[in-house]
Structure formats: structure tokens, C-alpha cells
Amino acid sequence: MSDEEVEHVEEQYEEEEEAQEEAPSPAEVHEPAPEVHVPEEVHEDALEDMREEEEEEEKPRPKLTAPKIPEGEKVDFDDIQKKRQNKDLMELQALIDSHFEARKKEEEELVALKERIEKRRAERAEQQRIRAEKERERQNRLAEEKARREEEDAKRRAEEDLKKKKALSSMGANYSSYLAKADQKRGKKQTAREMKKKILAERRKPLNIDHLSDEKLRDKAKELWDTLYQLETDKFEFGEKLKRQKYDIMNVRARVEMLAKFSKKAGTTAKGKVGGRWK
């Protein structure tokens, strides 16, 4: 028996139940109408109308018969209910499958987005690395060019000095002694500079404050401040002393120049004839 035939049988069965509910009981159908006491004043037409209505009510209604089911076939309502449940389950399963497919698609899109972000981040890091490497190469190239130029300048100056020395050495031995003296003076200056560096290195001790506490750090800072203040005071006093010394030297030079002028004038006025000749 096909599904369409089963549904058709179900519809006929439901229509039969509704008709039986709406149909009146046999007692109501065959119950005689009550007698009506009509007053004498009522017109005969009204009586006839009432009789016609009573006759219509007393007419028997057609009996409803159940639909005929083909012989050899039985309607299994459990099977119908089971099919409905299976249909609902299939629809629910389809909804669940579509939900999980959409969720799986969203997860795949999220994974693809993360992969694109990671790829872009790696590309950006690679670009930064290449840019930094190029910048490093450029700095190295500039440093090499600078060192090469300095080396060429030093070589050129050395060649020029050598040419000057050769040209001047050909002029005589006197210049060689002059060069020796100049080299000696230069050596003395370098020695004095080295001595100054050595003295400063001895005076300037390394500041080791990693192991000190807060109180000792404050004491050390106060000590350094006092030392700096004393150095500035000494510097100011030495500057003032140097100014006074320069002023005294200028005064002495002015007096010496004035005395030299007066002595020259006195020498010219004291000239005279001594021993038959002018002095």
C-alpha cells in the first residue's frame, strides 16, 4: 500500500469522525415534536407554516457510512506514526548536518585567515630582515670607503712629507739638524701628553657602586658633589690668578717699553765730542 493511499484513508477516517460528532443521536432524531397550543387568534397561515417546519424536522437525515477499505489491505496506524517520526527525524538530521557543515566551513575560513596572517607576518619579518641587511651592507660600504679615503689621504700626506724632506735635505746639512730638532720637540710633546694621560688615569679611579646600599650611595653622591664643588672653586681661583698674572705681565712690559724709550732718548742727548771725535 503506497503512502498516498494511506494518507487518503487517514483523511477519510478523520472526516468520518467529524461527521459522527456533528450528527445528532437517534433519540433526538426520532423524538416527536411537542404539541403546540396555538391561540385562536393566530391565523391559519401561521399554523400551516408551523406544521411544515415540524414535518421538515421529522424527516429522517441520511446516515453516514464509513469509507470502504479495499479488501485484502489493512491500515496500520503504527506504521503511519512511525513513518511520520522517521520523516521528522530525517528533517532534524538534515538541519543538524547543515549546521555542522556551516560550522565546519566557518572553522576552515578561520584557519585560512590565521594562515594568511601568519604568512603575511613572516613576509613582513623577512622584508625587515632584508632591509636591515641592506642597511648594514650600506653602512659597512660607507665605512670601508671612509677608511680607504683616510688611508689614501695619509699615504698622500706621507708622500708629500717625504718629497719635502728630500727636497730640503738636498739644500744642505743645516736643515737636517733643524729636522732633528723638530722631531725631538715633537717627541717631547708626545711624551708630555702621555704623562698627562698617565696622571689622569691614576687620579681617575673606576666608580664601583654596584655593591653599595642606599645610604652608602647617598654618602658617595655627597662626596662626589663636594669634590666637584671643590674642583670648580679651584678652577675659578686659578682663572682669577691667571688673569692677575697676565695683568701684571702687561704692566711690566709697558714699563719696560717706557724705560727703553727714555733710555734711548737719554743716549741720543748725551752724545758729545770726546778725545777729538764725536761719540
Swiss-Prot record:
One Gene Ontology term from the biological process aspect of the record: skeletal muscle contraction
Origin: domain of life: Eukaryota
Ranges of compositional bias, category Acidic residues: 1-21
Residues the record lists as Phosphoserine modifications: 2, 98, 169, 176-177, 213
Entry-linked InterPro entries: TNNT, Troponin, Troponin_sf
Modified residues annotated as N-acetylserine in this record: 2
One of the record's GO molecular function terms: tropomyosin binding
Keywords carried by this UniProt record: Acetylation, Muscle protein, Phosphoprotein
Signal peptide limits: none
Entry function: Troponin T is the tropomyosin-binding subunit of troponin, the thin filament regulatory complex which confers calcium-sensitivity to striated muscle actomyosin ATPase activity.
Name listed for the protein in its UniProt record: Troponin T, fast skeletal muscle
Organism field: Oryctolagus cuniculus (Rabbit)
Gene field: TNNT3
